[in-house]
Amino acid sequence: MADVDKLNIDSIIQRLLEVRGSKPGKNVQLQENEIRGLCLKSREIFLSQPILLELEAPLKICGDIHGQYYDLLRLFEYGGFPPESNYLFLGDYVDRGKQSLETICLLLAYKIKYPENFFLLRGNHECASINRIYGFYDECKRRYNIKLWKTFTDCFNCLPIAAIVDEKIFCCHGGLSPDLQSMEQIRRIMRPTDVPDQGLLCDLLWSDPDKDVLGWGENDRGVSFTFGAEVVAKFLHKHDLDLICRAHQVVEDGYEFFAKRQLVTLFSAPNYCGEFDNAGAMMSVDETLMCSFQILKPAEKKKPNASRPVTPPRGMITKQAKK
Protein backbone atom coordinates (compact mmCIF):
# COMPACT_ATOMS: atom_id res chain seq x y z
CA MET A 1 0.00 0.00 0.00
CA ALA A 2 3.01 2.28 -0.38
CA ASP A 3 1.25 4.10 -3.23
CA VAL A 4 -1.48 5.20 -0.81
CA ASP A 5 0.80 6.18 2.08
CA LYS A 6 2.78 8.73 0.09
CA LEU A 7 -0.08 10.06 -2.03
CA ASN A 8 0.17 13.85 -2.37
CA ILE A 9 -3.45 14.66 -3.21
CA ASP A 10 -2.98 18.43 -3.23
CA SER A 11 -0.15 18.18 -5.75
CA ILE A 12 -2.18 15.82 -7.96
CA ILE A 13 -5.21 18.14 -7.95
CA GLN A 14 -2.99 21.15 -8.64
CA ARG A 15 -1.42 19.49 -11.69
CA LEU A 16 -4.79 18.33 -13.00
CA LEU A 17 -6.14 21.88 -12.72
CA GLU A 18 -3.06 23.56 -14.24
CA VAL A 19 -4.42 23.03 -17.77
CA ARG A 20 -7.51 25.14 -17.04
CA GLY A 21 -6.43 28.00 -19.27
CA SER A 22 -4.95 25.76 -21.95
CA LYS A 23 -6.38 24.83 -25.31
CA PRO A 24 -8.71 21.86 -24.78
CA GLY A 25 -6.95 18.56 -25.38
CA LYS A 26 -3.73 19.17 -23.45
CA ASN A 27 -2.98 16.07 -21.38
CA VAL A 28 -1.87 15.83 -17.75
CA GLN A 29 0.47 12.87 -17.35
CA LEU A 30 0.46 11.82 -13.69
CA GLN A 31 2.89 9.18 -12.45
CA GLU A 32 1.58 5.64 -12.72
CA ASN A 33 2.06 5.06 -8.98
CA GLU A 34 0.02 8.20 -8.26
CA ILE A 35 -2.90 6.92 -10.33
CA ARG A 36 -2.65 3.52 -8.67
CA GLY A 37 -2.71 5.32 -5.31
CA LEU A 38 -5.85 7.26 -6.32
CA CYS A 39 -7.59 3.99 -7.21
CA LEU A 40 -6.58 2.19 -4.01
CA LYS A 41 -7.38 5.04 -1.63
CA SER A 42 -10.72 5.95 -3.23
CA ARG A 43 -11.68 2.24 -3.27
CA GLU A 44 -11.13 2.16 0.51
CA ILE A 45 -13.40 5.18 0.91
CA PHE A 46 -16.12 3.77 -1.37
CA LEU A 47 -16.20 0.57 0.70
CA SER A 48 -16.31 2.53 3.97
CA GLN A 49 -19.44 4.37 2.79
CA PRO A 50 -22.84 2.79 1.98
CA ILE A 51 -23.68 1.36 -1.44
CA LEU A 52 -26.93 3.38 -1.17
CA LEU A 53 -25.78 6.85 -0.13
CA GLU A 54 -27.96 9.06 2.04
CA LEU A 55 -27.04 12.65 1.22
CA GLU A 56 -28.17 16.10 2.29
CA ALA A 57 -28.83 19.19 0.19
CA PRO A 58 -27.50 21.61 -0.88
CA LEU A 59 -25.62 19.83 -3.62
CA LYS A 60 -25.05 19.83 -7.36
CA ILE A 61 -25.82 16.74 -9.43
CA CYS A 62 -24.08 15.95 -12.73
CA GLY A 63 -24.78 13.36 -15.42
CA ASP A 64 -22.49 11.61 -17.92
CA ILE A 65 -19.02 13.13 -18.50
CA HIS A 66 -17.49 10.46 -20.80
CA GLY A 67 -13.89 11.63 -20.81
CA GLN A 68 -14.72 15.23 -21.82
CA TYR A 69 -12.22 16.62 -19.33
CA TYR A 70 -12.35 20.27 -20.36
CA ASP A 71 -16.13 20.21 -20.06
CA LEU A 72 -15.76 18.76 -16.54
CA LEU A 73 -13.52 21.72 -15.70
CA ARG A 74 -16.20 24.05 -17.13
CA LEU A 75 -18.80 22.40 -14.89
CA PHE A 76 -16.65 23.10 -11.84
CA GLU A 77 -16.08 26.68 -12.99
CA TYR A 78 -19.86 27.11 -13.16
CA GLY A 79 -20.75 25.28 -9.96
CA GLY A 80 -17.70 26.12 -7.87
CA PHE A 81 -14.61 23.95 -7.46
CA PRO A 82 -14.81 21.63 -4.44
CA PRO A 83 -15.21 22.25 -1.55
CA GLU A 84 -17.13 25.40 -2.57
CA SER A 85 -20.07 23.16 -3.52
CA ASN A 86 -21.06 19.60 -2.71
CA TYR A 87 -21.31 17.26 -5.72
CA LEU A 88 -22.96 14.03 -6.74
CA PHE A 89 -21.98 12.52 -10.11
CA LEU A 90 -24.23 9.87 -11.65
CA GLY A 91 -21.60 7.75 -13.45
CA ASP A 92 -20.12 7.28 -16.94
CA TYR A 93 -16.84 9.09 -16.33
CA VAL A 94 -14.86 7.13 -18.92
CA ASP A 95 -15.12 6.03 -22.59
CA ARG A 96 -16.05 7.89 -25.79
CA GLY A 97 -14.18 11.13 -24.97
CA LYS A 98 -10.46 11.73 -25.41
CA GLN A 99 -9.42 12.25 -21.77
CA SER A 100 -10.97 9.58 -19.61
CA LEU A 101 -7.81 9.37 -17.49
CA GLU A 102 -7.73 13.04 -16.49
CA THR A 103 -11.47 12.95 -15.88
CA ILE A 104 -11.51 9.94 -13.56
CA CYS A 105 -8.29 10.97 -11.80
CA LEU A 106 -9.64 14.42 -10.88
CA LEU A 107 -12.92 12.91 -9.66
CA LEU A 108 -11.15 10.27 -7.55
CA ALA A 109 -8.75 12.90 -6.18
CA TYR A 110 -11.67 15.09 -5.07
CA LYS A 111 -13.34 12.02 -3.50
CA ILE A 112 -10.20 11.40 -1.44
CA LYS A 113 -9.76 15.08 -0.52
CA TYR A 114 -13.43 15.71 0.38
CA PRO A 115 -14.93 12.28 1.18
CA GLU A 116 -18.04 13.69 2.92
CA ASN A 117 -18.79 16.39 0.32
CA PHE A 118 -18.05 14.73 -3.01
CA PHE A 119 -19.83 11.62 -4.24
CA LEU A 120 -19.55 9.37 -7.30
CA LEU A 121 -22.07 6.74 -8.39
CA ARG A 122 -21.37 3.89 -10.78
CA GLY A 123 -22.45 4.14 -14.41
CA ASN A 124 -22.77 1.30 -16.92
CA HIS A 125 -19.38 2.33 -18.37
CA GLU A 126 -17.66 1.75 -15.01
CA CYS A 127 -17.64 -1.91 -15.96
CA ALA A 128 -14.76 -3.84 -17.54
CA SER A 129 -16.74 -5.49 -20.36
CA ILE A 130 -17.97 -2.06 -21.52
CA ASN A 131 -14.91 0.17 -21.09
CA ARG A 132 -12.77 -2.58 -22.63
CA ILE A 133 -14.55 -1.73 -25.91
CA TYR A 134 -15.44 1.97 -25.82
CA GLY A 135 -12.10 3.68 -25.31
CA PHE A 136 -10.90 3.56 -21.71
CA TYR A 137 -8.92 0.34 -22.06
CA ASP A 138 -7.20 1.68 -25.18
CA GLU A 139 -6.39 4.99 -23.47
CA CYS A 140 -4.90 3.19 -20.45
CA LYS A 141 -2.90 0.87 -22.71
CA ARG A 142 -1.64 3.74 -24.89
CA ARG A 143 -0.68 6.10 -22.06
CA TYR A 144 0.28 3.61 -19.33
CA ASN A 145 -0.40 -0.15 -19.39
CA ILE A 146 -3.11 -2.79 -19.12
CA LYS A 147 -2.29 -3.45 -15.46
CA LEU A 148 -3.43 0.08 -14.62
CA TRP A 149 -6.75 -0.53 -16.41
CA LYS A 150 -7.23 -3.58 -14.19
CA THR A 151 -6.55 -1.43 -11.11
CA PHE A 152 -9.33 0.93 -12.24
CA THR A 153 -11.64 -2.07 -12.68
CA ASP A 154 -11.02 -3.07 -9.04
CA CYS A 155 -11.89 0.49 -8.01
CA PHE A 156 -15.03 0.73 -10.19
CA ASN A 157 -16.30 -2.57 -8.76
CA CYS A 158 -16.61 -0.82 -5.37
CA LEU A 159 -18.47 2.35 -6.43
CA PRO A 160 -21.84 3.05 -4.78
CA ILE A 161 -24.91 2.35 -6.92
CA ALA A 162 -27.57 4.84 -5.83
CA ALA A 163 -28.19 7.84 -3.58
CA ILE A 164 -31.18 9.37 -1.83
CA VAL A 165 -31.05 13.12 -1.18
CA ASP A 166 -32.91 14.23 1.96
CA GLU A 167 -35.17 11.16 1.75
CA LYS A 168 -36.90 12.68 -1.31
CA ILE A 169 -34.72 12.45 -4.46
CA PHE A 170 -33.68 9.00 -5.69
CA CYS A 171 -30.53 9.10 -7.84
CA CYS A 172 -28.95 6.39 -9.98
CA HIS A 173 -27.30 6.15 -13.38
CA GLY A 174 -29.90 4.30 -15.43
CA GLY A 175 -33.29 3.86 -13.83
CA LEU A 176 -35.76 1.63 -12.06
CA SER A 177 -35.94 -2.16 -11.93
CA PRO A 178 -38.93 -4.51 -11.87
CA ASP A 179 -37.00 -6.36 -9.13
CA LEU A 180 -36.76 -3.30 -6.85
CA GLN A 181 -39.35 -3.60 -4.08
CA SER A 182 -37.34 -2.35 -1.11
CA MET A 183 -34.30 -0.09 -0.69
CA GLU A 184 -32.90 -2.83 1.52
CA GLN A 185 -32.29 -4.86 -1.67
CA ILE A 186 -29.80 -2.23 -2.84
CA ARG A 187 -28.15 -2.10 0.58
CA ARG A 188 -27.66 -5.88 0.47
CA ILE A 189 -25.59 -5.83 -2.75
CA MET A 190 -22.07 -6.88 -1.78
CA ARG A 191 -19.00 -5.14 -3.15
CA PRO A 192 -16.67 -5.59 -4.97
CA THR A 193 -18.98 -6.70 -7.77
CA ASP A 194 -19.04 -6.73 -11.54
CA VAL A 195 -22.25 -5.62 -13.27
CA PRO A 196 -24.35 -8.69 -14.13
CA ASP A 197 -26.23 -9.12 -17.42
CA GLN A 198 -29.62 -8.92 -15.73
CA GLY A 199 -31.29 -8.23 -12.41
CA LEU A 200 -31.44 -5.32 -9.99
CA LEU A 201 -27.87 -3.99 -10.27
CA CYS A 202 -27.95 -4.25 -14.07
CA ASP A 203 -31.26 -2.36 -14.28
CA LEU A 204 -30.18 0.47 -11.95
CA LEU A 205 -27.29 1.15 -14.36
CA TRP A 206 -28.96 0.37 -17.71
CA SER A 207 -32.75 0.96 -17.78
CA ASP A 208 -34.45 3.91 -19.51
CA PRO A 209 -37.78 5.75 -19.21
CA ASP A 210 -40.04 5.55 -22.29
CA LYS A 211 -43.16 7.67 -22.77
CA ASP A 212 -44.62 5.12 -25.18
CA VAL A 213 -44.50 2.22 -22.74
CA LEU A 214 -47.12 1.13 -20.24
CA GLY A 215 -45.41 -0.65 -17.37
CA TRP A 216 -42.18 -2.37 -18.45
CA GLY A 217 -40.91 -2.75 -22.02
CA GLU A 218 -38.02 -4.15 -24.02
CA ASN A 219 -34.95 -1.93 -24.20
CA ASP A 220 -33.39 -1.20 -27.61
CA ARG A 221 -29.97 -1.42 -25.95
CA GLY A 222 -30.50 -5.18 -25.78
CA VAL A 223 -30.08 -5.10 -22.00
CA SER A 224 -32.44 -4.31 -19.12
CA PHE A 225 -35.86 -2.67 -19.64
CA THR A 226 -37.71 0.52 -20.37
CA PHE A 227 -40.35 1.80 -17.96
CA GLY A 228 -43.36 4.06 -18.32
CA ALA A 229 -44.68 7.06 -16.39
CA GLU A 230 -46.98 4.94 -14.23
CA VAL A 231 -44.02 2.87 -12.98
CA VAL A 232 -42.34 6.13 -11.90
CA ALA A 233 -45.46 7.42 -10.11
CA LYS A 234 -45.99 4.13 -8.25
CA PHE A 235 -42.33 3.93 -7.19
CA LEU A 236 -42.33 7.49 -5.83
CA HIS A 237 -45.60 6.96 -3.97
CA LYS A 238 -44.49 3.64 -2.46
CA HIS A 239 -41.19 5.04 -1.16
CA ASP A 240 -42.48 8.53 -0.25
CA LEU A 241 -40.13 10.20 -2.75
CA ASP A 242 -40.57 13.32 -4.89
CA LEU A 243 -38.18 12.82 -7.82
CA ILE A 244 -35.99 10.34 -9.66
CA CYS A 245 -32.77 11.84 -11.00
CA ARG A 246 -30.83 9.77 -13.55
CA ALA A 247 -28.42 10.14 -16.49
CA HIS A 248 -27.53 7.55 -19.18
CA GLN A 249 -29.16 9.23 -22.22
CA VAL A 250 -28.11 12.21 -24.33
CA VAL A 251 -30.76 14.93 -24.07
CA GLU A 252 -30.70 18.04 -26.22
CA ASP A 253 -30.91 20.65 -23.46
CA GLY A 254 -28.71 18.78 -20.97
CA TYR A 255 -31.76 17.97 -18.85
CA GLU A 256 -35.19 16.61 -19.70
CA PHE A 257 -38.24 15.88 -17.56
CA PHE A 258 -40.45 12.80 -17.82
CA ALA A 259 -43.69 11.65 -16.19
CA LYS A 260 -45.02 15.09 -15.19
CA ARG A 261 -41.66 16.18 -13.79
CA GLN A 262 -41.40 13.15 -11.53
CA LEU A 263 -38.18 12.04 -13.27
CA VAL A 264 -35.34 14.08 -14.74
CA THR A 265 -32.54 12.94 -17.04
CA LEU A 266 -29.24 14.82 -16.69
CA PHE A 267 -26.46 14.72 -19.27
CA SER A 268 -23.34 16.79 -18.60
CA ALA A 269 -21.20 16.28 -21.74
CA PRO A 270 -22.02 19.06 -24.24
CA ASN A 271 -21.41 18.36 -27.95
CA TYR A 272 -21.26 14.70 -26.96
CA CYS A 273 -18.43 12.98 -28.87
CA GLY A 274 -18.21 16.10 -31.06
CA GLU A 275 -21.15 14.67 -33.00
CA PHE A 276 -24.25 15.83 -31.14
CA ASP A 277 -25.40 19.41 -30.79
CA ASN A 278 -26.59 18.88 -27.22
CA ALA A 279 -26.06 21.14 -24.22
CA GLY A 280 -24.77 19.78 -20.91
CA ALA A 281 -26.51 20.46 -17.61
CA MET A 282 -25.95 20.32 -13.88
CA MET A 283 -28.83 20.31 -11.39
CA SER A 284 -28.51 22.42 -8.24
CA VAL A 285 -30.60 21.26 -5.30
CA ASP A 286 -30.96 23.90 -2.57
CA GLU A 287 -31.76 23.41 1.13
CA THR A 288 -35.51 23.49 0.41
CA LEU A 289 -35.04 20.83 -2.33
CA MET A 290 -35.82 23.32 -5.06
CA CYS A 291 -34.06 22.19 -8.22
CA SER A 292 -32.55 24.55 -10.79
CA PHE A 293 -30.35 23.88 -13.80
CA GLN A 294 -27.04 25.32 -14.94
CA ILE A 295 -26.46 24.80 -18.64
CA LEU A 296 -23.22 24.32 -20.56
CA LYS A 297 -24.08 25.43 -24.08
CA PRO A 298 -22.79 23.41 -27.00
CA ALA A 299 -20.09 24.89 -29.20
CA GLU A 300 -20.90 26.05 -32.74
CA LYS A 301 -22.82 23.41 -34.66
CA LYS A 302 -20.62 20.77 -36.25
CA LYS A 303 -21.52 18.33 -38.97
CA PRO A 304 -22.78 15.14 -37.32
CA ASN A 305 -20.55 12.16 -37.88
CA ALA A 306 -22.71 9.15 -38.58
CA SER A 307 -19.86 6.71 -38.09
CA ARG A 308 -19.91 6.51 -34.28
CA PRO A 309 -21.09 3.02 -33.36
CA VAL A 310 -24.12 2.76 -31.12
CA THR A 311 -23.77 0.69 -27.96
CA PRO A 312 -24.53 -2.83 -29.16
CA PRO A 313 -26.53 -5.37 -27.15
CA ARG A 314 -24.89 -6.27 -23.86
CA GLY A 315 -24.40 -9.94 -24.71
CA MET A 316 -22.45 -8.98 -27.80
CA ILE A 317 -20.12 -6.72 -25.83
CA THR A 318 -19.44 -9.40 -23.27
CA LYS A 319 -18.51 -11.84 -25.99
CA GLN A 320 -16.19 -9.34 -27.66
CA ALA A 321 -14.55 -8.53 -24.35
CA LYS A 322 -13.70 -12.16 -23.75
CA LYS A 323 -11.53 -12.36 -26.87
Curated annotation (Swiss-Prot):
Gene Ontology terms: biological process: cell division; glycogen metabolic process; mitotic nuclear membrane reassembly; protein dephosphorylation
Name of this protein: Serine/threonine-protein phosphatase PP1-gamma catalytic subunit A
Listed CDD domains: MPP_PP1_PPKL
Role: Protein phosphatase that associates with over 200 regulatory proteins to form highly specific holoenzymes which dephosphorylate hundreds of biological targets. Protein phosphatase 1 (PP1) is essential for cell division, and participates in the regulation of glycogen metabolism, muscle contractility and protein synthesis. Promotes nuclear envelope reassembly by targeting nuclear membrane vesicles to chromatin at the end of mitosis. Acts by dephosphorylating membrane proteins such as lamin B receptor (lbr) to regulate the binding of membrane proteins to chromatin.
Region (Disordered): 300-323
Keyword presence, Nucleus: yes
Family to which this protein belongs: Belongs to the PPP phosphatase family. PP-1 subfamily.
GO cellular component terms listed in the entry, alphabetical order: cleavage furrow; cytoplasm; kinetochore; membrane; midbody; mitochondrion; nuclear speck; nucleolus
Record's keyword terms, sorted: Carbohydrate metabolism, Cell cycle, Cell division, Centromere, Chromosome, Cytoplasm, Glycogen metabolism, Hydrolase, Kinetochore, Manganese, Membrane, Metal-binding, Mitochondrion, Mitosis, Nucleus, Protein phosphatase
